[in-house]
């Protein structure tokens, strides 16, 4: 394998698969990814001061990797109304958050108009403190809410944008292969539907992130296929702001009890995934975010030398990873994030959702 030729050229899906299959050149792959990272984004590592607001844990979904879901009537079930969501957003804004990430569940009572009401309330209550960016509703949530409202996805996206939606999390992607999806999230939107929602969001002027959850039942060919789909979308729309690899947290997830399921990814696969993503995307998707919530502080720091250039956010509240067995906390102060970055010899810079540096 001529790794050095991969530095300049756009590698194919076949090349990508070969990198995942390769067991002999791990450190050379890491070194190449770090070199590409330095060429494209330099030594700056960005972070965002943000808050996660999960407005309900009640959901009709059947995702087998989710340990966060509750049923109606469960003692731990909760459902925040739009005013309660707005109050949480205001609290976050008052202590410096520039972004709130708002997500909920799949329920008949959650339609596009309910989502729009959340957006309006958040925008109104935070207006006196300078506008906060609302990064909200996964592609699955948008599709489900549109159906509940009797709207097309396009109609729903326009309503959400008009009411203050600034950007969307590109979650619900998991692995973009319908055979895998039929096993791990059988009632979630299909690959083509996920693509339809995000491409239409981009065309509506709503940027999104993109993600990939790995370390469960997928094979290397599925990882290469997934990255290839994301790059194709980015070439067409340019609407992805970042790529976030999400390592599967298995401890409390129902999926963990299925045969064939791995006990999460190895540390080697975690780092390899960051590296191969950087080599594959190059500057099509310039920003690759590491997740301290899922990897922990030390492995996140190592990933910054494997192609990643963003360390995510302060979060302030993050319930989903914690429910799945994540043990690295749900909040990290801005000072600690900066210390993490400085400790590996890189330059910390606060950014906004659009990756513009906040001086």
From Swiss-Prot:
It is an enzyme of class 2 (transferase). [4Fe-4S] cluster binds at residues 59, 63, 66. The keyword Cytoplasm does not apply. InterPro entries: Aldolase_TIM (IPR013785), CofH/MnqC-like_C (IPR045567), CofH_family (IPR019940), Elp3/MiaA/NifB-like_rSAM (IPR006638), F420 (IPR034405), FO_synthase_su2 (IPR020050), rSAM (IPR007197). Keywords: 4Fe-4S, Iron, Iron-sulfur, Metal-binding, S-adenosyl-L-methionine, Transferase. Pathway: Cofactor biosynthesis; coenzyme F0 biosynthesis. Its cofactor is [4Fe-4S] cluster. SUPFAM superfamilies: Radical SAM enzymes (SSF102114). Binds 1 [4Fe-4S] cluster. The cluster is coordinated with 3 cysteines and an exchangeable S-adenosyl-L-methionine. Residues 45-282 form the Radical SAM core domain. Its EC number is 2.5.1.147. GO terms for molecular function: 4 iron, 4 sulfur cluster binding; 5-amino-6-(D-ribitylamino)uracil--L-tyrosine 4-hydroxyphenyl transferase activity; 7,8-didemethyl-8-hydroxy-5-deazariboflavin synthase activity; iron ion binding. It catalyses: 5-amino-6-(D-ribitylamino)uracil + L-tyrosine + S-adenosyl-L-methionine = 5-amino-5-(4-hydroxybenzyl)-6-(D-ribitylimino)-5,6-dihydrouracil + 2-iminoacetate + 5'-deoxyadenosine + L-methionine + H(+). The keyword Iron-sulfur applies. Belongs to the radical SAM superfamily. CofH family. Consists of two subunits, CofG and CofH. Catalyzes the radical-mediated synthesis of 5-amino-5-(4-hydroxybenzyl)-6-(D-ribitylimino)-5,6-dihydrouracil from 5-amino-6-(D-ribitylamino)uracil and L-tyrosine. This is 5-amino-6-(D-ribitylamino)uracil--L-tyrosine 4-hydroxyphenyl transferase. It comes from Methanococcus maripaludis (strain C5 / ATCC BAA-1333). The gene is cofH.
């Amino acid at each position: 394998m001529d790794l050095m030729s991969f530095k300049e050229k756009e590698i194919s899906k076949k090349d990508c698969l070969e990198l995942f299959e390769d067991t002999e050149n791990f450190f050379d792959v890491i070194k190449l990814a770090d070199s590409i990272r330095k060429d494209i984004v330099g030594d700056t590592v960005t972070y965002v001061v943000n808050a996660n607001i999960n407005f309900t844990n009640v959901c009709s979904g059947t995702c087998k990797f989710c340990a966060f879901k509750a049923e109606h009537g469960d003692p731990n079930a909760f459902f925040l109304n739009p005013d309660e969501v707005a109050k949480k957003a205001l609290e976050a804004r008052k202590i410096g958050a520039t972004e709130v990430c708002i997500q909920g569940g799949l329920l008949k009572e959650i339609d596009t108009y309910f989502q729009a009401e959340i957006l309006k309330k958040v925008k109104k209550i935070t207006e006196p403190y300078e506008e906060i960016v609302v990064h909200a509703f996964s592609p699955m949530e948008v599709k489900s809410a549109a159906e509940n409202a009797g709207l097309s996805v396009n109609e729903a996206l326009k309503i959400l944008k008009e009411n203050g939606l600034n950007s969307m999390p590109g979650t619900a992607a998991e692995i973009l292969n319908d055979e895998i999806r039929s096993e791990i999230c059988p009632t979630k939107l299909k690959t083509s539907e996920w693509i339809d929602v995000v491409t239409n969001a981009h065309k509506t002027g709503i940027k999104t992130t993109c993600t990939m959850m790995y370390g469960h039942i997928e094979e290397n060919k599925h990882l290469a296929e997934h990255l290839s789909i994301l790059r194709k979308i980015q070439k067409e729309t340019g609407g992805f702001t970042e790529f976030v690899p999400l390592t599967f947290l298995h401890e409390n997830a129902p999926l963990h009890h299925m045969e064939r399921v791995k006990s999460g990814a190895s540390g080697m696969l975690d780092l390899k995934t960051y590296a191969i993503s950087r080599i594959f995307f190059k500057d099509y998707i310039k920003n690759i975010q590491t997740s301290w919530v899922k990897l922990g502080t030390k492995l996140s720091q190592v990933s910054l030398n494997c192609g990643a250039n963003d360390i995510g956010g302060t979060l302030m509240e993050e319930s989903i990873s914690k429910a799945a067995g994540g043990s690295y906390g749900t909040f990290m102060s801005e000072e600690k994030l900066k210390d993490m970055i400085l400790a590996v010899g890189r330059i910390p810079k606060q950014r906004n959702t659009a990756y513009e540096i906040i001086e």
